[in-house]
Amino acid sequence: MWDSVLGHEQNKEFLQNFLQREARPHALLFCGAEGLGKKKLALEFAKTFLCLNGKGDDGCEACRLLNFADGNVSHPDFILVERLPEKRDLSIEQMRDLAKQAAFAPVLSKNKICIVEDADRLTEAAANSFLKLLEEPPAGWLIILLASSEDKLLTTILSRVVKLRFNPLAVADVKKLLLARGVAENESEVLARISEGSVGTAL
């Protein structure tokens, strides 16, 4: 499952088991350096999580509304919070908007999922506002935080999430992805070795 995401097999196994559980944690933290595939796996998982047949294989209406490759994302139960282009951090206004959305139940799928990118870039006020959402999570919600470092996250936030660590990829995995994207053999070898296990760095 999620073969488009290279490596991170332990995290994939956790997420596969997560889907089978009745009692689930309401918040996960994907933590690791930039370019390791945290967002990619979060998006692929979101598609499966919201899928009406549990496969995430584009076979249902929910999947068709989460076409990340084409930028066609209109699923009413999917929320992505990311820094605005002109902003350095995630703002309290964004967290307040998220809190307002928490009042609404799932529309199409059984659950709702919210991915918060750059969660380690929350302002202090935004972090405290977000903490209230974690303390009283809406029914049927799953929140996934993406962060490069947990050091900048409030300890009270860390205590309310299940952490999945993303480690650097093997050189062979980085090279495989580069080749799949049309990079020449010799160049792929060099880029993979200097990438420090980060596809983002290699590209």
Language-model features: where?
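Non-catalytic interfacial helical region
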Residues: 6, 13, 83-203
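P-loop/Walker A NTP-binding region and its immediately flanking N-terminal helices
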Residues: 1-118, 142
